[in-house]
UniProtKB/Swiss-Prot annotation:
Enzyme class, first EC level, given as a word: ligase
Binding site for ATP: 630
Main location: cytoplasm
NCBIfam families, per the entry: leuS_bact
Protein name per the record: Leucine--tRNA ligase
One GO cellular component, as annotated: cytosol
UniProt motif 'KMSKS' region: location: 627-631
Similarity-based family: Belongs to the class-I aminoacyl-tRNA synthetase family.
The keyword Ligase is assigned to this record: yes
Reactions that this protein is recorded to catalyse: tRNA(Leu) + L-leucine + ATP = L-leucyl-tRNA(Leu) + AMP + diphosphate
GO molecular-function terms, A-Z: aminoacyl-tRNA deacylase activity; ATP binding; leucine-tRNA ligase activity
Keywords from the UniProt entry: Aminoacyl-tRNA synthetase, ATP-binding, Cytoplasm, Ligase, Nucleotide-binding, Protein biosynthesis
C-alpha cells in the first residue's frame, strides 16, 4: 500500500476496474429487489457546473448505498439535447447545432465519468437522435388520432423583425431580446395537449405521493388551480348593444354578486371589438393591450388600465344596468374573457374603480366592518355575512352560494361550475433545433398524421440557423411531400415540439433504450418503473414534473406502463452558492470578479471583512453569497477541483457541507478539510496494513477499554444507517465517521486484539464512506485484505451486543448546576442512583445545611437535586 494518498492514481485505477468489470451494467433480475435511482438529465451546455456535480453526487450516493443493501440498482444517464441555447451558440459561432451539441456531450460525458458515477452507460439516451424522437412522434400521432392532441389558434409574442415567435422571457420591456423590435401579439395555429382532461387526476393523485416534498405538491396544486365557482350571465342591454345575448363570466365569489358595479372584458372579447367600431381612441387602447405581455405574472403586476365603452349589460338578479369596460387585466383565455367587478371585495377591481371613479358597494360584513374606506384593506376580501343584498342578507358564504345559484338557475342565467387555472399545453415552436411535429397538411384531407412506417420525420442536422424565423420553413426539400391519404402534393409541418416533451418520458425509455418495436418494452418498463428516487432542482417543481406526470398517465392509457405515477420519491437538492465580489463600473453597472481572483481578509470569527483583487491589490465590494452563475462570475469549475483534489474530496465536501435539500455554500477551506480527512484515513490504514493484517477479533475476550472503542464503532454504524437510510442526512453520517476516526487514531495497537479491533474499525469506516468516496474505499477495501470489490460488499450491520454498556456515567446537578459525576452499573435501580448521587463527596458540600425538596433522575443521563 502506497504511503501517500494519491487521488489521481487511486481514482484512475478504480474507474478502470469498474469499466473492465462492467460493474454498473444492469439487467432485469426477477425475484431481486429493484431500485431505480434517477437524477434529472442535463442539457449539454458545454461543461458541467457545480449544480450538476451536486445533483449527480447525491444520486450516486443513494444508488451505491441501495446496492450495498443488496438491491438490483438502475442508475442511467442521458442528454436533454434539443433547445434554444444550441441555436444561439450556432448563430454566434457559425456552427450547426447538431455538431455543437454532440461535441458538448462528448466532453461532459468525460467529466461525469471523472466523478466516478455508478452509471450504466449502455442505457444512455440522447433526445436529439432520431432513434429517440421517432417514438415521441409515434406517440404524437396516436394521441392526435385520439383527439388528445388538437390544433387551434393561440396567442403568441411575434417578433416582426426576426419573423419568429418569442417565449415570454425573451420579451424584454416589450421588445425582442435579439432584434430590439416592438413585439406584437399574434394568433397562429398551434398544437395543444389536452392536459386539462387530466387536471382532476393530476390533482388527486398528488395524494399518492407521500415521498414528495409538501412544497412541490402545493406548487402543483396551485398551478392546476381547481376552484369551485359560478358561471353568471349578464343579459345584453339591447338599446346599447343592438342585439340579444348574454355576457358570460366565471366567479369564485358569487356571494358578492349583489355588489357588482361594472363588468370588464378582455381586449380580444367580441364586445370590445364591437365597441371599438367608430371609436379610434378605444381601438388604439385595444391594440396597446394586445401588444402587451401574454405572461400571467406580468398581468398581475402591471398597471391596471381600462377604457369605458358605451355598452351596458343588465344585472342578472336586479336588472340594474352596468357599464362595460375594456381592461388590460382581464385574460381572454381564463374563464370567458370577462369579469364581474365587485370593487368593495376584490383588490384589483377596487384599484380600478378608484382610478376611474366607478361606484363601490359593500355587500359582505367583514372584520373591518360594513363600510369600505378609500384605501384597500386585506379584510375587505374576507368571507362573511351578506349585507345590502336584498333577500340574501344574513347568509354566510356557503348559504349565499346555494341561494344565489338557485336564483340564477330559476332565471336560466347561471349555474355552479368547476374551473381550473391549468391551460392546455401548447407545444408548437417555430424553432429549428427540436423534434419535428409529424403532421402533413393536405389541401383536401386536412391535417394528416405521418404513418408509422414513414417515421421518424428526421430533422436535417447540417443546418446553421440565422435567427430569422424557422429554417425548416425555408427548406422545400424538408416540407414538400405528398399526402399519405390521397397522394396529392402536400406540405409537411415545419414547427417543432416544445423541448419539455422529450424530458416528459425519458425516464421510461431508460428501461429499454434500444427497443425498436415501441416507445418502451412494457415488460422492462414495468419491471423498473416507477422511479424509486428522483433528484433535481426545485425550479422544475411545476412544468417538468407536471408534464412528466401527465405523460406517464398518457403512457398508462396507451397500455405501455401500469403504474399511475412516474416518481415514487422526489428529492429537490438545494442550490450551490458562493461569495460574490464586484466593483461599480463607470457606466453604473457592476463588474464581477471570480472568488479565485480575490484575496480576502477575515475577522476572528472567520467572517469576511475585506477583499482585494489579486492583480492590482485594490479593494473590491463584497456582494454576499449568491447562487453560482455566469452573470455574477462566482462559479467554481468542477474540473479544476477534481484535478487539484480528486473526485472523492469534491464528493465528500459536497455531501458533508450541508443536507442535500439545503443550499450548499462553497468554501475552499471546506474542500481542504475534506482532503485532509481522506489523507488521515489513508494514513491510519497504511500504518495498520504495513504491520501485516491481524487475525480474527475475539469479541468475548475484550477488556473494558476495548469495549469502549468497539461501542464507538457500532454506535457510528447505527446512527449513520439511520441518517442515510431514513433521512438522506449524509452530512451527519459523515460526522459519525469522523467521530470514529478520532477514536481509532488514539486506540492502542499493542496487542493482536488491539489490531483486530482497529481492522474492524477501518473496515466500518471504509464501508460507511463507500457510497460517498467510492475510489478511496475501493483501494482501502483491497488493502484491508478483501478479495471482492467494495461495490459488492454489504452495508455494515450493527452488533447490538457491542452497544450494551456495563456501566454508565451520570452527571449530578444541585439546583440545575453541575456539581459532580457518579459511575453506576447500567442496570442500577433509581434508588441506587439517587443514593450514590446524594453521597457524592462534592455534592455533599453543596447540599450541606439545605433541605432536599425533590430528586429528579433522568435514566442514563443525570440526577438533579432540588434543595433550599
Amino acid at each position: 500500500m502506497h504511503e501517500q494518498y494519491t487521488p489521481r492514481d487511486i481514482e484512475a485505477a478504480a474507474q478502470k476496474f469498474w469499466d473492465e468489470q462492467q460493474s454498473f451494467a444492469v439487467t432485469e433480475q426477477p425475484g431481486k429487489d429493484t431500485y431505480y435511482c434517477l437524477s434529472m438529465f442535463p442539457y449539454p451546455s458545454g461543461k458541467l457546473h457545480m449544480g450538476h456535480v451536486r445533483n449527480y453526487t447525491i444520486g450516486d450516493v443513494i444508488a451505491r448505498y441501495q446496492r450495498m443493501l443488496g438491491k438490483n440498482v438502475l442508475q442511467p444517464m442521458g442528454w436533454d439535447a434539443f433547445g434554444m441555447p444550441a441555436e444561439n451558440a450556432a448563430m454566434k459561432n457559425n456552427v450547426a447545432p447538431a455538431k455543437w451539441t454532440y461535441e458538448n456531450i462528448d466532453y461532459m460525458k468525460t467529466q461525469l465519468k471523472s466523478l466516478g458515477l455508478a452509471i450504466d452507460w449502455a442505457r444512455e439516451v440522447t433526445t436529439c437522435k432520431p432513434d429517440y424522437y421517432r417514438w415521441e412522434q409515434w406517440l404524437f400521432t396516436r394521441l392526435f388520432e385520439k383527439g388528445i392532441i388538437y390544433r387551434k389558434n393561440g396567442t403568441v409574442n411575434w417578433d416582426p423583425a426576426d419573423q419568429t415567435v418569442l417565449a415570454n422571457e425573451q420579451v424584454i420591456d416589450g421588445r425582442g431580446w435579439r432584434s430590439g423590435a416592438l413585439i406584437e401579439k399574434r394568433e397562429i395555429p398551434m398544437y395543444y395537449f389536452r392536459i386539462t382532461d387530466y387536471a382532476d387526476e393530476l390533482l388527486e393523485s398528488l395524494d399518492e405521493l407521500p415521498g414528495w416534498p409538501e412544497q412541490v405538491k402545493t406548487m402543483q396544486r396551485n398551478w392546476i388551480g381547481k376552484s369551485r365557482g359560478m358561471e353568471v350571465q349578464f343579459p345584453y342591454d339591447q338599446a346599447s348593444i343592438g342585439h340579444e345575448g348574454t355576457l358570460k363570466v366565471f366567479t369564485t365569489r358569487p356571494d358578492t354578486l349583489m355588489g357588482a358595479t361594472y363588468v370588464a372584458v378582455a381586449a380580444e372579447h367580441p364586445l370590445a371589438t364591437q365597441a371599438a367600431q367608430g371609436n379610434p381612441a378605444l381601438q388604439a387602447f385595444i391594440d396597446e393591450c394586445k401588444s402587451g405581455s401574454v405572461a400571467e405574472a406580468d398581468m398581475a403586476t402591471q398597471e391596471k388600465k381600462g377604457m369605458a365603452t358605451s355598452l351596458l349589460v343588465e344585472h342578472p338578479l336586479t336588472g340594474e344596468k352596468l357599464p362595460v369596460w375594456v381592461a388590460n387585466y382581464v385574460l381572454m383565455h381564463y374563464g370567458d374573457g370577462a369579469v364581474m367587478a365587485v370593487p368593495a371585495h376584490d383588490e384589483r377591481d377596487f384599484e380600478f374603480a378608484h382610478k376611474y371613479n366607478l361606484p363601490v358597494k359593500a355587500v359582505v360584513r367583514t372584520s373591518a366592518g360594513d363600510e369600505v374606506g378609500s384605501e384597500w384593506q386585506a379584510a375587505y376580501g374576507e368571507h362573511g355575512q351578506l349585507i345590502n343584498s336584498a333577500e340574501f342578507d344574513g347568509l354566510d358564504f356557503a348559504g349565499a352560494f346555494d341561494a344565489i345559484e338557485a336564483a340564477l338557475i330559476r332565471k336560466e342565467l347561471g349555474k355552479s361550475r368547476t374551473q381550473f387555472r391549468l391551460r392546455d399545453w401548447g407545444i408548437s415552436r417555430q424553432r429549428y433545433w427540436g423534434c419535428p411535429i409529424p403532421i402533413i397538411h393536405c389541401p383536401s384531407c386536412g391535417d394528416v398524421p405521418v404513418p408509422e412506417d414513414q417515421l421518424p420525420v428526421t430533422l436535417p442536422e447540417n443546418v446553421v440557423p440565422d435567427g430569422a424565423g424557422s429554417p425548416l420553413a425555408r427548406m422545400p426539400e424538408f416540407y414538400e411531400c405528398s399526402c399519405p391519404k390521397c397522394g396529392a402534393a402536400a406540405k409537411r409541418e415545419t414547427d417543432t415540439m416544445d423541448t419539455f416533451v422529450e424530458s416528459s418520458w425519458y425516464f421510461a425509455r431508460y428501461a429499454s433504450p434500444n427497443y425498436d418495436k415501441g416507445l418502451v418494452d412494457p415488460k422492462a418498463a414495468n419491471h423498473w418503473l416507477p422511479v424509486d428516487q428522483y433528484i433535481g432542482g426545485i425550479e422544475h417543481a411545476i412544468l417538468h414534473l407536471l408534464y412528466a406526470r401527465f405523460f406517464h398517465k398518457l403512457m398508462r392509457d396507451e397500455g405501455l406502463v401500469t403504474s399511475n405515477e412516474p416518481f415514487k420519491n422526489l428529492l429537490t437538492q438545494g442550490m450551490v452558492v458562493a461569495e460574490t465580489y464586484y466593483r461599480v463600473a463607470s457606466n453604473g453597472g457592476k463588474d464581477w470578479f471570480n472568488p479565485a481572483d480575490v484575496e480576502i481578509e477575515r475577522d476572528a470569527k472567520a467572517k469576511i471583512i475585506g477583499a482585494r483583487l489579486k492583480t492590482d491589490g485594490l479593494p473590491v465590494e463584497i456582494g454576499g453569497t449568491e447562487k453560482m452563475s455566469k452573470s455574477k462570475n462566482n462559479g467554481v469549475d468542477p474540473q479544476s477541483m477534481i484535478e487539484a483534489y480528486g473526485a472523492d474530496t469534491c464528493r465528500l465536501f459536497m455531501m458533508f457541507a450541508s443536507p442535500p435539500d439545503m443550499s450548499l455554500e462553497w468554501s475552499d477551506s471546506g474542500v481542504e478539510g475534506a482532503s485532509r480527512f481522506l489523507r488521515r484515513v489513508w494514513r491510519l490504514a497504511q500504518a495498520h496494513v504495513s504491520q501485516g493484517l491481524p487475525g480474527k477479533l475475539d469479541v468475548a475476550a475484550l477488556d473494558d477499554a476495548q469495549k469502549v472503542i468497539r461501542r464507538a464503532i457500532h454506535a457510528a454504524i447505527k446512527q449513520a444507517s439511520t441518517d442515510v437510510g431514513q433521512f438522506h442526512k449524509f452530512n451527519t453520517a459523515i460526522a459519525q465517521v469522523m467521530t470514529v476516526m478520532n477514536v481509532l487514531e488514539k486506540a492502542p495497537q499493542a496487542t493482536e486484539q488491539d489490531r483486530a479491533l482497529l481492522q474492524e474499525g477501518l473496515e466500518a469506516v471504509t464501508l460507511l464512506l463507500a457510497p460517498i468516496t467510492p475510489h478511496i474505499s475501493h483501494a482501502l477495501w483491497q488493502h484491508l485484505g478483501h478479495a471482492g470489490s467494495v461495490i459488492d460488499a454489504a452495508w455494515p450491520s450493527v452488533d447490538e451486543q457491542a452497544l450494551v454498556q456495563d456501566s454508565i456515567t451520570l452527571v449530578v446537578q444541585v439546583n440545575g448546576k453541575l456539581r459532580g459525576q457518579v459511575e453506576m452499573p447500567a442496570a442500577a435501580s433509581r434508588e441506587e442512583v439517587e443514593a450514590a448521587a446524594r453521597s457524592n463527596e462534592n455534592v455533599l458540600r453543596f447540599i450541606d445545611g439545605l433541605t432536599i425538596r425533590k430528586v429528579i433522575v433522568v435514566p442514563g443521563k443525570l440526577v438533579n437535586i432540588v434543595a433550599n
